[in-house]
Amino acid sequence: MTKIIFMGTPDFSTTVLEMLIAEHDVIAVVTQPDRPVGRKRVMTPPPVKKVAMKYDLPVYQPEKLSGSEELEQLLQLDVDLIVTAAFGQLLPESLLALPKLGAINVHASLLPKYRGGAPIHQAIIDGEQETGITIMYMVKKLDAGNIISQQAIKIEENDNVGTMHDKLSVLGADLLKETLPSIIEGTNESVPQDDTQATFASNIRREDERISWNKPGRQVFNQIRGLSPWPVAYTTMDDTNLKIYDAELVETNKINEPGTIIETTKKAIIVATNDNEAVAIKDMQLAGKKRMLAANYLSGAQNTLVGKKLI
């Protein structure tokens, strides 16, 4: 069986790891260190570590791989292939050169578009109608190696980061399973990326999460979809942060300053943008409160909201 080092961290990576465990000999798993999670800051292992522990696989968790003791240990292994999927660190050249068959990455975009750490978020924020999975060889430069295989998938109007993450996670494992035999046999072909067409999807920053209502409704809607259910787009109402998990677009002829609540229905809070498409907030969370449907919030506040300004 092919001896593989797997490197990944979040839920996206777990379906790939499960497939590799079923089909090949995973001799080591490299992931990020345990991190404090939640209000109580409980030290929590990354999802990939949980899978690895279930199968009693050796786990390495370097804070930074380059120059680490873990790297020195990995370099002693007899390995055929390195597979990464959302690992979260660049690999040092010494590790890239280790496996006989090279190092490959499962990336959640149609490269060369959306290189970087947040390709699913950015594709939805940008209003793309499709995205996909790329299997490519790894090089020192971020997400720039030769493409081995690709498969596209449609982004539906009601998709958000959560739904696309789940679809792409499965697609990534399936495409890798189809692609690996030719890599192992040495019969695969690969195509260089066109660097002139490269775009980048940097990790989401806090400032990317705040909604600017002075934009077309479609852009605001895509931002909400592209940040839900994590890290979640937010606005401010009555000096209180308001996270928006779900919304829809509605046509309106009411002319109001962007950010103004122009109407409430039984199920939504409707907010003006800078064009004739308003945003209907359907699922929300006020700071310090539990997440709730707008319908539940409106049962006690419907008559007091119209005319308020979100900023």
From Swiss-Prot:
The keyword Transferase applies. One of its GO terms (molecular function) is methionyl-tRNA formyltransferase activity. It catalyses: L-methionyl-tRNA(fMet) + (6R)-10-formyltetrahydrofolate = N-formyl-L-methionyl-tRNA(fMet) + (6S)-5,6,7,8-tetrahydrofolate + H(+). Transmembrane segments: none annotated. Its EC number is 2.1.2.9. Pfam families: Formyl_trans_C (PF02911), Formyl_trans_N (PF00551). CDD domains: FMT_core_Met-tRNA-FMT_N, Met_tRNA_FMT_C. (6S)-5,6,7,8-tetrahydrofolate binds at residues 109-112. It comes from the Bacteria. The keyword tRNA processing does not apply. Keywords: Protein biosynthesis, Transferase. Belongs to the Fmt family. Attaches a formyl group to the free amino group of methionyl-tRNA(fMet). The formyl group appears to play a dual role in the initiator identity of N-formylmethionyl-tRNA by promoting its recognition by IF2 and preventing the misappropriation of this tRNA by the elongation apparatus. This is Methionyl-tRNA formyltransferase. It comes from Staphylococcus aureus (strain JH9). The gene is fmt.
